[in-house]
Amino acid sequence: MSVSDLRQSYEKSTLLEDSAAASPFDQFSQWFDQALAAQVPEPNAMTLATVDADGQPSARIVLIKGYDSRGFAFYTNYESRKGHDLLANPRAALLFFWQPLERQVRIEGRVEQVSAEESDAYFHSRPLGSRIGAWASRQSQPVTRAELEAREQEIRARYGEQPPRPPHWGGYRVVPTLFEFWQGRPSRLHDRLRYLPDGRGGWAIDRLSP
């Protein structure tokens, strides 16, 4: 079978205007809870797309670590490629793909750093190995495996079981300016609902052609 012959018919659900939540945050919460209930693998995994100062895009999978009406938070090394991209161009796009439910959620928005207190709280909730790793990894820089493991041992010896949060590590929050909810439907006539700010503190919903 060739790649062009790979097809799947989407028939599991619908997404209609009269049943969609008025708030995209509420709609996201409903779908996220359903992904959890369906035991979708890593439902908090999302594609994060950024663009550097020269307009070169890059994308990677990261894990969302919190969301509320302020936006969607994730944590990383500020000196990584994504960190440099966001310093030059503080805008990003997110994409959640919950394949077992035949659903996608796309989010666009501006990006801000979370507070130091939020970064500290999340950092100290992580397993020890992950906290050590945040120090050991000079993210996105070339390294050999031996160098990386030596650095890990050095950090363990220095900090023991209480490493502080590195100054180059912390959180970002994507503050949405657009949501799109996608539900697969038969014959590629998918449901796509877009939410945009209505200028009055709420959100306007429209249907997009599939």
UniProtKB/Swiss-Prot annotation:
Positions that bind substrate: 7-10, 65, 122, 126, 130, 188-190
PROSITE patterns associated with the record: PYRIDOX_OXIDASE (PS01064)
Binding site for FMN: 60-65, 75-76, 81-82, 104, 139-140, 182, 192
Cofactor note: Binds 1 FMN per subunit.
Pathway terms, separated by semicolons: Cofactor metabolism; pyridoxal 5'-phosphate salvage; pyridoxal 5'-phosphate from pyridoxamine 5'-phosphate: step 1/1; Cofactor metabolism; pyridoxal 5'-phosphate salvage; pyridoxal 5'-phosphate from pyridoxine 5'-phosphate: step 1/1
MF terms in GO: FMN binding; pyridoxamine phosphate oxidase activity
Cofactor(s) required, per the database record: FMN
Alphabetized UniProt keyword annotations: Flavoprotein, FMN, Oxidoreductase, Pyridoxine biosynthesis
Lineage: superkingdom: Bacteria
GO BP term (any one): pyridoxine biosynthetic process
Pfam families documented for this protein: PNP_phzG_C, PNPOx_N
Swiss-Prot/TrEMBL catalytic activity: pyridoxamine 5'-phosphate + O2 + H2O = pyridoxal 5'-phosphate + H2O2 + NH4(+); pyridoxine 5'-phosphate + O2 = pyridoxal 5'-phosphate + H2O2
Disulphide-bridged cysteine pairs: none
The protein's enzyme class: oxidoreductase
EC number: 1.4.3.5
NCBIfam families, per database record: pdxH, PRK05679.1
Quaternary structure note: Homodimer.
Stated family: Belongs to the pyridoxamine 5'-phosphate oxidase family.
PANTHER family according to UniProt: PYRIDOXINE-5'-PHOSPHATE OXIDASE (PTHR10851:SF0), PYRIDOXINE-5-PHOSPHATE OXIDASE (PTHR10851)
Task performed by this protein: Catalyzes the oxidation of either pyridoxine 5'-phosphate (PNP) or pyridoxamine 5'-phosphate (PMP) into pyridoxal 5'-phosphate (PLP).
Protein name, entry field: Pyridoxine/pyridoxamine 5'-phosphate oxidase
Originating organism: Bordetella petrii (strain ATCC BAA-461 / DSM 12804 / CCUG 43448)
Gene behind the chain: pdxH
